[in-house]
């Protein structure tokens, strides 16, 4: 059931403008505007030490010190594996995320839908009537399924999840959502470094 529409413009003022955008556009913007000497690609982190600052050790024997570390290297994060080695790896949260695109959705506000064991959000990403679709679905999986990264790329698996949501909402998402990606959701304990 749709629970609300959010018009972001109501939060705008002279100094702050709120918007939504496609993740790829954000990455393009960041790569264009962050000096290239500040970005290091294809580095292999092997250890993290905490003295007065965070010291990151890389496979090429290079060490760098930082005040902060943001671990944003994905679901199967090498950084998280290093950080959580004493705490155990993040655990599957019995939930799966779906992400996709919708063309020409009827409502230009952010739309939030809640249902039994799922929710989804549809929001505009540009002025060309392109929208992002994001959903979280409760789904128990056995360890073998969780470990099978190919499962989350299988069309049958993804279509079954979309059908679950579509059958409990007033939208036929299986026909509307395109370029769907699917991934398991993991949770981690909060740790102090």
Question: What residue ranges belong to the model's regions?
Answer:
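Conserved FAD/dinucleotide-binding core of flavoprotein oxidoreductases
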Residues: 4-18, 22-28, 59, 63-64, ...
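Short amphipathic alpha-helical patches
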Residues: 93, 102-106, 185-186
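FAD-binding beta-loop-beta segment adjacent to the flavin cofactor pocket
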Residues: 182-193
